[in-house]
């Protein structure tokens, strides 16, 4: 039985992506500036991980229904409430932000009363701790270092596999994606917590993967078509990988949409940010990281790239 590959687009596509190079650069610069300005004015909605808050440790007589608990506590109007098991499935950690000292005891009692009235469990409150913003600052620094090291590792990988200007093209695209993702977080008031740091790193990985696929095809076409200029080769390479790019982005977005709809509040910020980042990463791999090579690559420099 013959197996036919799934194709969303015809085999021969000749769309002139490079004709939109200046438009895409201008569009990206405007979006990046808007993101910077918005972040500067409205800041981020820091979650408990970074802003600090209260941690209540509870032991129950049986395993709790966490999704239902999150729904009940989320309606109390005290901001983000994070519930997690630790140790055994009967041990529960409840974290929430502390807006002011006056509301501190009030919110703790509100949570206790809500749990008692809505659930048939026996609650043993073992510890109540305050987590200060100093811990949050340390986590922010650790997250920033994680992103920095990921940038450096990617640069080295691309440099070894291709050439330095390929790495520079990907770096510019990644900075673009991260700026837009952070701007999107600020505009939509998504909670800035540890899961969103993981989301940004996921976006970086996805964007790099997309760009490397196109770069590989560019290098292959440099070997095949000696008389074409770099603009023609980049256009050809993007068109040849377009079907794969669209299939990948659709399947990834569908999987991520399931997380947004059914994953619950605990991973909502992660899922929404990754959904946006996949779109931004796909755009940047086609309209930024590939076209930007025309600034660095010409025929006299292509020999080293072709030989790798």
UniProtKB/Swiss-Prot annotation:
Record's keyword annotation contains Membrane: yes
Listed GO CC annotations: plasma membrane
Membrane topology term: Multi-pass membrane protein
Pfam family, one: Sec_GG
UniProt keyword terms in alphabetical order: Cell inner membrane, Cell membrane, Membrane, Protein transport, Translocation, Transmembrane, Transmembrane helix, Transport
Physiological role: Part of the Sec protein translocase complex. Interacts with the SecYEG preprotein conducting channel. SecDF uses the proton motive force (PMF) to complete protein translocation after the ATP-dependent function of SecA.
Protein's name in the database: Protein translocase subunit SecF
